[in-house]
Swiss-Prot record:
The gene is mhpE. It catalyses: (S)-4-hydroxy-2-oxopentanoate = acetaldehyde + pyruvate. GO terms for molecular function: 2-isopropylmalate synthase activity; 4-hydroxy-2-oxovalerate aldolase activity; manganese ion binding. PROSITE patterns: PYR_CT. It comes from the Bacteria. It comes from Burkholderia pseudomallei (strain K96243). This is 4-hydroxy-2-oxovalerate aldolase. The lineage of its organism: Bacteria, Pseudomonadati, Pseudomonadota, Betaproteobacteria, Burkholderiales. SUPFAM superfamilies: Aldolase (SSF51569), post-HMGL domain-like (SSF89000).
Length: 347
């Protein structure tokens, strides 16, 4: 099973000058938990101890951010980003005290040696430690493997390659991830940025190459051109048969819910357009499908699925109404029969 680490409440902070509020953190963490996200990463964009005049000051402390998220999470694990030098051992101690589950110790891709004491500190407390190699485009595969091996030796349970500049192309990602997968005895992860419009493609290639962890943010909410868009990634992963704890429909619900309390402004693809792509429907049908779903009071995404089964082509708008009406009738019969689905009755 692929682990999804959601950096919306950490990398997303970069996009708004680190101004996430406690209310936003609580609302998103609760929604991500309900959506089945594995790890919810929280904090200043630069991680624990990052709030400063130089890097940008947060309106609330690391303690309050983490306590707020901890209180909202039930099944998702709470994660933090930590850069040695910006953060101190005391910052990790605070995070562990509050109940952080995953500490991601991040260094420049050629400076893994500075991660040792912090990985060891995390493991000694019985928590999960990931190593993160930032700006990974700046080192060739063999050099990255050597650095990752150091993190593995220190006790890291996974190493994540971070394409911090959004520089990488699929061929570069494949070569580097394959090298780490072949050379390590721990899991490999990948964190993409979308500067070249390749974040989802690069993440899929990383998975094909053997990565078991992918990072993403709702609506691509993150630094610069944004991160891998969570909704698009999950849709593409479903198409490719990757197993996760969440589903496309659950992350769609998560993304739409953020419009009331987060509403990221980073460039992203709308949920309805992702659905039309996932199910192979003509893009021009989207407003018609949304209107029909609203008029008949049916689930929009179930309607996409039904229309995909009909293999619609352009010019068949009438079938949208037909299928929406059928879904509404099935719903009414289901209610009348105490929850038995119409398709089950006719099977």
């Amino acid at each position: 099973m692929i682990l999804i680490s959601d950096a919306t409440l950490r990398d997303g902070n970069h996009a708004i000058r680190h101004q996430l509020s406690a209310a936003q953190i609580h609302a998103y963490a609760r929604a991500a938990d309900e959506a089945g996200i594995d790890v919810v990463e929280v904090g200043h964009g630069n991680g624990l101890g990052g709030s400063s005049c130089l890097l940008g000051q947060t309106p609330i402390s690391d303690r309050l951010m983490l306590e707020t998220a901890r209180a909202a999470l039930r099944t998702s694990r709470l994660g933090v980003h930590f850069i040695p030098g910006l953060g101190k051992a005391a910052d990790i101690s605070l995070a562990l005290e509050i109940g952080v589950d995953v500490v991601r110790v991040a260094t420049h891709c050629t400076e893994a040696n500075v991660s040792a004491r912090f990985i060891e500190q995390t493991r000694a407390a019985g928590r999960t430690a990931f190593g993160v190699l930032m700006m990974s485009h700046m080192a060739p595969p063999d050099a990255l493997l050597a650095q990752a091996k150091l993190m593995e030796r220190y006790g890291a349970q996974a190493v994540v390659l971070m394409d911090s500049a959004g520089y990488s192309t699929p061929s570069l990602v494949r070569a580097k991830v394959e090298r780490l997968v072949d050379g390590l005895d721990i899991d490999v992860g990948f964190h993409a940025h979308n500067n070249l419009g390749l974040a989802v493609a690069n993440s899929l290639v990383a998975l094909e190459a053997g990565a078991r962890i992918v990072d993403a943010c709702v609506k691509g909410f993150g630094a610069g051109a944004g991160n891998t868009q969570l909704e698009t990634l999950v849709a593409a992963m479903e198409r490719e048969g990757h197993d996760t704890r969440t589903t496309f429909e659950r992350v769609m619900t998560l993304a739409r819910g953020t419009e009331t309390f987060l509403n990221p402004k980073t460039p992203h693809i709308q949920p309805a357009n992702i659905a039309s792509g996932l199910y192979g429907l003509f893009s021009g049908y989207v407003p018609h499908i949304q209107k029909a779903a609203q008029e008949f009071g049916v689930n929009e995404f179930e309607l996409y699925k039904r229309l995909a089964e009909r293999k619609l082509v352009a010019g068949q708008e009438d079938i949208i109404i037909e299928e929406a009406s059928r879904l509404a009738r099935e719903r009414d019969v289901q209610r009348a029969t105490g929850g038995v689905r119409v398709r089950e009755l006719s099977a």
